[in-house]
């Protein structure tokens, strides 16, 4: 399956207050977001930063019933997921399932940047939530 992974797409960090986090990342690290927008179907507001060849996403829940709100309640702020770039998300999902991974999204959906995404359950990946992003 490793041949299906192209590289790192981004790292996602869950925050309780995106506006405060934006201030922190600007004053502490000098980072300015490329965009800030709401992703309604995921019930989040997200800010994306280009950091060299990589991307960092900060996101807050917009609904207390969202999975991100649940994550924050259980674990607090911090790294939420690692996103890996793939050419063919469906082939990667099929290979992951055949290898025994539990997929969260049986069908890919559209992510914050308009590309197809799907998640692998952290119980299948040694405690790390993996997002697959078709580039």
Residue ranges, per PLM feature:
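Vicinal oxygen chelate
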Residues: 1-4, 47-50, 84, 93-135
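N-terminal beta-strand motif that seeds the catalytic metal site of vicinal oxygen chelate
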Residues: 1-22, 77-86, 135
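Short glycine/proline-centered loop/turn elements that form peptide/ligand docking sites
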Residues: 20, 38-42
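Short, solvent-exposed interaction modules
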Residues: 70-99
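Conserved active-site tyrosine of GNAT-family acetyltransferases
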Residues: 21-26, 96
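A short, acidic/glycine-rich surface segment
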Residues: 34-35, 65-69
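Conserved catalytic-core motifs of GNAT/GCN5-like acyltransferases
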Residues: 33-39, 107-111
